[in-house]
Structures are given as C-alpha cells and as structure tokens.
Amino acid sequence: VEWTGASSDLAVKDVVLITPEDYKLSQNYPNPFNPTTTIEYTLPIASQITITIYNVMGQEVATILPLQDKPAGTYRVQWNGLDKSGNRVASGTYFYTMRFGNFTKTKQLTFMK
C-alpha cells in the first residue's frame, strides 16, 4: 500500500423525490359554468397525463386531454360542456380526473344550462 498524500472530496447530493402531491390540479373556473370552463394543472416533472370528465355514475363523458407527454410546467385546458359524441351534456355535477402514472387527482365541477 502506497500513500500518495492525495485527498478526494466527498459531496452530498440532494435527492428530490416527486410525490403525487407535487402534481397540482386546480379547481376549474368559472364554476358553475356555461358554455366553457378552464382547468389548470401543474406538472413538477415531464409526465404522461390525461384529463377525463366523468358523470356522477362514473361513466366517461369526455376526454379533454388525451394521453400525451408534457414537459414540467403549468398548463390550462378548456372543456366546452360537450360529451365525446359532440352533444351538450345535461346540467349537473361532473368530475374531472387527471391521471399521471399510477396516480389520479379528481375535482368536481358543475355545468348549468
């Protein structure tokens, strides 16, 4: 074993853990709405996400953001109150769900004719 007298620096690196809580899904505005509403969401890292509208029975009404890759950032999407067939939905309560990986966030909105 030979001693060279050289030293090396050890560094501690911060590890950033991203949790589902770091993903933000804001309350839509306006709410109640007619004819359109805006939904804002924030991604802390690049993610594959989708946003879907459901009725109170849990049936899919519309997909307002098909599955896609998005870089980190804050985004807005609008829903015009139309179902996936292009028909105006009935007045009432609906839920919008953002899916990212194995996680979901859901909020409630109200459409009024």
Regions found by a protein language model. Give the residues of each.
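Short, surface-exposed loop/turn motifs with a glycine/proline- and acidic-biased composition
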Residues: 65-101
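Glycine-centered coil/turn sites that cap beta-strands in beta-rich domains
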Residues: 11-29, 33-54, 63-66, 76-79, ...
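C-terminal tail/sorting-segment detector
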Residues: 1-3, 10-14, 87-113
